Amino acid sequence: MAPRILYVVTEDWYFLSHRLPMARAAEAAGYEVHVAARLKDGRAGIEKEGFTPHALH
């Protein structure tokens, strides 16, 4: 089982614009990447990267 990392940000777009390079590096290092955020238009981008989204309400 791969280690997991959880990014917690307020908005999905913020993750994609500011944390994506770090998340890609974590995945390349063998981590399973999860993202907790308010999910709107950026959800598809998070899923396209192969990361697991979690909705914050």
How would you name each of these model-derived features?
Residues 28, 33-57:
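Conserved nucleotide-sugar phosphate-binding/catalytic loop shared by glycosyltransferases and other
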Residues 1-38:
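N-terminal subdomain of nucleotide-sugar transferases
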